[in-house]
Regions:
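Short, solvent-exposed loop/turn segments at secondary-structure junctions
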Residues: 41-42, 134, 170
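Beta-strand-turn-beta hairpins that frame and shape the catalytic cleft
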Residues: 2-4, 116-125, 174-179
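Short, acidic/polar N-cap/turn motifs at the starts of alpha helices
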Residues: 112-116, 168-169
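Histidine-centered catalytic micro-motifs
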Residues: 9-10, 126-131, 161-169
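Active-site-proximal segments of metal-dependent phosphoesterases and phosphodiesterases across multiple
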Residues: 83-87, 121-156
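Core catalytic region of metal-dependent phosphoesterases/phosphodiesterases
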Residues: 3-7, 12-109
Length: 181
């Protein structure tokens, strides 16, 4: 049986990433699923991306909102009263983007918004967080019920749904469908 490690929302925390990757190595993980947000907030964006690149043969990664800001730009309304981000957050994103090499930016540009893979006969849907029709993250639900999970992922044909973004963990199972945050 294949061993899969799941990470998400690393946020440029190279120390935590190295600790997790060391544990993955000890237990001989075959694949690493990363649900995005490898950059942003933390102080080591370049080092974090480079460390993940060393594992790219094992890595299945999707784009989080922090990678989306790098690739598509920050929200346009940052200087008005309805802004979605504080000025400090904007400064952090700009600083993070300035610290990334072209090599790292090219690596990040390859991340899909979502991915469906099949492992051992199971379809696995991977996303940072389910998106609405505008491509933005739906309303955050920190500890979703099974009913909320079913609504979040309605219309997607998969056996296992893996996501992040909320910085919490949960596992729900119903009718042989697994929802892993």
């Amino acid at each position: 049986k294949m061993k899969i490690g799941i990470i998400t929302d690393v946020h440029s925390n190279i120390i935590a990433l190295n600790k997790v990757l060391s544990e993955f190595e000890k237990i001989k993980i075959d694949k690493i699923i990363c649900c995005g947000d490898i950059i942003g907030i933390g102080s080591k964006p370049e080092e974090t991306v480079q460390e993940l690149m060393k594992n790219k043969d094992k890595l299945i990664v999707v784009r989080g909102n922090h990678e989306q800001y790098l690739l598509k730009g920050l929200p346009k309304n940052v200087h008005d009263d309805k802004r979605t981000m504080s000025l400090e957050e904007i400064d952090n994103h700009e600083w993070t983007h300035s610290k990334l090499s072209e090599n790292s930016k090219n690596f990040i540009s390859q991340f899909k918004i979502s991915n469906i893979i099949e492992i051992e006969g199971k379809k696995i849907y991977i996303v940072h967080y389910p998106n609405n029709e505008n491509g933005l993250c739906k309303k955050h639900i920190k500890n979703p019920t099974i009913k909320q999970n079913e609504e979040m992922f309605s219309g997607i044909d998969a056996d296992i749904f893996i996501y992040g973004h909320t910085h919490t963990t949960s596992i729900n199972n119903k009718n042989n469908k697994w929802y892993i945050n």
